[in-house]
Curated annotation (Swiss-Prot):
<dbReference type="GO" id="GO:0050661">
    <property type="term" value="F:NADP binding"/>
</dbReference>
<protein>
    <recommendedName>
        <fullName>Ferredoxin--NADP reductase</fullName>
        <ecNumber>1.18.1.2</ecNumber>
    </recommendedName>
</protein>
<feature type="binding site">
    <location>
        <position position="89"/>
    </location>
    <ligand>
        <name>FAD</name>
    </ligand>
</feature>
<dbReference type="InterPro" id="IPR036188">
    <property type="entry name" value="FAD/NAD-bd_sf"/>
</dbReference>
<keyword id="KW-0560">Oxidoreductase</keyword>
<keyword id="KW-0521">NADP</keyword>
<dbReference type="InterPro" id="IPR022890">
    <property type="entry name" value="Fd--NADP_Rdtase_type_2"/>
</dbReference>
<feature type="binding site">
    <location>
        <position position="44"/>
    </location>
    <ligand>
        <name>FAD</name>
    </ligand>
</feature>
<feature type="binding site">
    <location>
        <position position="49"/>
    </location>
    <ligand>
        <name>FAD</name>
    </ligand>
</feature>
<feature type="binding site">
    <location>
        <position position="123"/>
    </location>
    <ligand>
        <name>FAD</name>
    </ligand>
</feature>
<comment type="similarity">
    <text>Belongs to the ferredoxin--NADP reductase type 2 family.</text>
</comment>
<dbReference type="GO" id="GO:0050660">
    <property type="term" value="F:flavin adenine dinucleotide binding"/>
</dbReference>
<comment type="subunit">
    <text>Homodimer.</text>
</comment>
<dbReference type="GO" id="GO:0004324">
    <property type="term" value="F:ferredoxin-NADP+ reductase activity"/>
</dbReference>
<dbReference type="InterPro" id="IPR050097">
    <property type="entry name" value="Ferredoxin-NADP_redctase_2"/>
</dbReference>
<feature type="binding site">
    <location>
        <position position="36"/>
    </location>
    <ligand>
        <name>FAD</name>
    </ligand>
</feature>
<dbReference type="InterPro" id="IPR023753">
    <property type="entry name" value="FAD/NAD-binding_dom"/>
</dbReference>
């Protein structure tokens, strides 16, 4: 498929920052398309933790990840973005007047500027090395929580010691019948406030924390768990824990895919940018959100929102040099019509 029109901006990535970039571009009179390898918008927020509460979005004391995604998508709707989902950009070629992006499914998109808002790129869970685990996946073994109600009055085992493990332990303690947290070490790598809540719930007997233990095996049939076997790292003793669900939170494996071949000077999993404009080393290609790197960078959604505004302001000046921008606050000009 080939889109005949030339978009002002092509946004690579439909996570929260990518969605807000649609809005920022639209507020400056620029139309856009959004390309993402996932079938749904929202990135990790929608796929890995839609019901996880987020506390550091300005104006929201608390908002779930999915509600944030829904609000951002609704905010972008007046600008009628074209969503090209379930596809990733394989190549970028540059002509005299525009870029041409080719996806893995043969879609061709023309645009005048590109904003990469791809987060950490493609992602997938780090699967624990347990025999037969794939038989249970998406039945009684999950790497994310999409609906907390699934675990109501159930026996749940959480494995891991990072933010996801600790956050979900605290949240699922409100609904689970029994909740176990399995961790190899005494220390957890999570926010201090979350750790405090975790310890309080453990003291109250609402969470059973097993340290130093690791996963050793699964027991069940037809994809339904009966128990999770854990092993004491010090004594090597193994014990079964009755369980309906196992949630292994060992992080995700990120993959930037073809982005590393776009001539953007990728370092690790990030693209170096000019802090004030989010320009990359290629003209008219920008990077925002977690994938953008500069001295002092903080990986927060709200920082990505700011970067989206900076990039769109610069793109508008580059694409329309003869049309000065009369800056106005949104409270004064409202939502423009493209």
């Amino acid at each position: 498929m080939e889109y005949s029109s030339v978009f002002d901006v092509a946004i690579v990535g439909a996570g929260p920052v990518g969605l807000f970039t649609v809005f920022q571009a639209g507020m400056l009179g620029m139309n856009s398309c959004v390309i993402d390898a996932l079938d749904i918008v929202g990135g990790q927020c929608a796929v890995l933790y839609p019901e996880k509460p987020i506390y550091d979005i300005p104006g929201y004391p608390m908002i779930t990840a999915q509600d944030l995604v829904n609000n951002l998508k609704k905010q972008a709707e007046p600008f009628a973005p074209v969503y090209i989902m379930g596809q990733f950009v394989e190549s970028i070629s540059e002509g005299p007047d525009c870029f041409v992006l080719q996806t893995n499914k043969g879609t061709s998109v023309k645009c005048r500027a590109i904003i990469v808002a791809a987060g950490s790129g493609g992602f997938g869970p780090n699967r624990p090395p347990l025999d037969g685990i794939m038989e249970y996946e998406n039945k009684s073994v999950f790497y994310n929580v999409s609906q907390m109600a699934t675990f109501k009055n159930k026996k749940v085992v959480i494995a891991g010691g990072g933010d996801s493990a600790a956050d979900w332990a605290v949240n699922l303690a409100e609904v689970a019948d029994k909740l176990y947290v399995i961790h190899r070490r005494k220390s957890f790598r999570c926010a201090p406030n979350t750790l405090k809540k975790l310890e309080e719930l453990a003291d109250e007997g609402r969470i059973n924390v097993l340290i130093p233990y690791q996963l050793a095996g699964l027991d069940g049939e037809n994809g339904e768990l009966r128990s999770v076997v854990v092993r004491n790292i010090t004594t090597k003793e193994e014990i079964p824990i009755g369980a309906d669900f196992l949630l292994p939170f060992f992080g995700i494996s990120a993959n930037l895919g073809e982005i590393v071949n776009w001539g953007l000077g990728v370092e690790g999993f990030q693209i170096p940018v000019e802090q004030s404009t989010c320009r990359t080393r290629r003209s008219k290609i920008y990077a925002v959100g977690d994938i953008a790197a500069y001295p002092g960078k903080i990986k927060l959604i709200l920082v990505g929102f700011s970067e989206a505004a900076l990039a769109c302001q610069d793109i508008r000046a580059v694409l329309f040099p003869d049309t000065p921008l009369n800056f106005q606050y949104s409270t004064s000009k409202g939502i423009p019509t493209l």
